[in-house]
Amino acid sequence: MMFTKSTALALAAIVALSNVNAFSTSIHQPITSKAAHITSSSSLQAANNGLDTDTTLPSFSTKEEYTSYLQKAGRLPSGFAVGTAKGTFVSVEAPALGPLPIKATVIHLTEGPTDSWAAVFTKQSGCPVKVGKARLSGGHPLQALVINNKVSNVCPGGDGIAAAESVCAAVASSLNLPGGANSVLPSSTGVIGWRLPAKELAEDVAPRAIEALQTESAYAAAEAIMTTDRYPKLRSKTLSDGVRVVGVAKGAGMIEPNMATMLGYIMTDATIEKSKLQTMLTEACNRSFNSISVDGDESTSDTVVAIASGLKPLSSEDELKDALFEVCEGLSADLVRNGEGTGHVIRVTISNFPGSEYDARRMGRHLVNSPLVKCAISGNDPNTGRIAGAIGSFMGKFFPTESVAEMSLTLGGRTIFNNGQFVLEGDAVEKELSGHMSDAQLGEHDDFPKHQKFVEIGVDFGGSGSDVIVLGSDLTKEYVEVNADYRS
């Protein structure tokens, strides 16, 4: 059978019936003037055999249990300090809303600037992303990052780039950075179209975040960068030689990748050439953040940064590469599980796709972005025709001449479509499939991840081809409610 337009229509009838720049060797330049207020925990810094996050997170019974787990697993790599602070501002665009909360996060390389940093940015750039791209193209070493939530600084009135630069300059001044504002990378997330409250950030919130700098855990950063996120996201891995990799991320809505997605910051104390770090990050992002979708909307602020302090020798580049991917993979799964209104996380495993990995990911995202598929899964309704219909829609548009004679579909490990027809007989099958969905359901207002289960969909085209995994979420009433009330 060939996937012509008529085939796609026939399948629909069946359904009715049933990017980025590079770096080179890490430059570690110790400086004598450091923020005197940085605190340290000798017990946490002394050993490199502390707790890491599990590849698959355990089940948690309470928010406190989850928080404690992340705080311990978030032990910072050598040479990093993190500080956060809260403040308020009044939006020029919506003054009737009154004072609104805003948070700033500062990540500081305590021992000096580094050239060994990599980044992947969205293709549709807001002001902070434009500044970040300029930092990369200019070859500037980094010594700090500053992140604010609540306002994304995208297409604002006034000069958004100048506003971002003024905050960077304030951070550089407070930390006495020899590289000045060019050694600070800005990120913003929040409401699009509002002016960045640069004065409040530069004169109040960011300086207080610097006063709060500590070298213990990255957990505070994971918490402070949240917007509509229900809980913080953090992953970590310690290599056999003691090198540490710790990542934090935020994102709950507008999650659809295009080079990168959401905000993510990965810190390591490894000594690694910047060009190699860039290659590792790009590959890790393609296999993780670029393989997820919550709602199909791309953000204009999306940024993923990996930065190395260079304080520890690296025994194995392959081990670092694997650790970087494991951290990115874990964070990307956490983003979907924490998606706005997510009631189920969908994991689509595509095997032997008759095209590139890029196109296989496109098909997977097309499937998880289908409103009909999302709604069926939200209601624990095993309407398998909607899954087949979404696949038929994609293949009919983009691969109309490809044969699907050997294609099979599974739901929860059970075959539901094979040899050109559905395999659905008896109430027991319906009950089994619905039970699989119900078992993976999340609570409407969970403020911590109670489990790590997925609604499992398998698509095997037979023969040989590309293999990918794509994650997505269902569509719930809560998603509509969150986005209806977002600015307030």
Curated annotation (Swiss-Prot):
GO terms for cellular component: mitochondrial matrix. It is found in: Mitochondrion matrix. It catalyses: N(2)-acetyl-L-ornithine + L-glutamate = N-acetyl-L-glutamate + L-ornithine; L-glutamate + acetyl-CoA = N-acetyl-L-glutamate + CoA + H(+). Substrate binds at T227, K250, T261, E340, N483, S488. GO terms for molecular function: glutamate N-acetyltransferase activity; L-glutamate N-acetyltransferase activity. The alpha and beta chains are autoproteolytically processed from a single precursor protein within the mitochondrion. The active site is at T261 (nucleophile). It comes from the Eukaryota. One of its GO terms (biological process) is ornithine biosynthetic process. HAMAP family: ArgJ. Heterodimer of an alpha and a beta chain. This protein may be expected to contain an N-terminal transit peptide but none has been predicted. This is Arginine biosynthesis bifunctional protein ArgJ, mitochondrial. It comes from Thalassiosira pseudonana. The lineage of its organism: Eukaryota, Sar, Stramenopiles, Ochrophyta, Bacillariophyta.
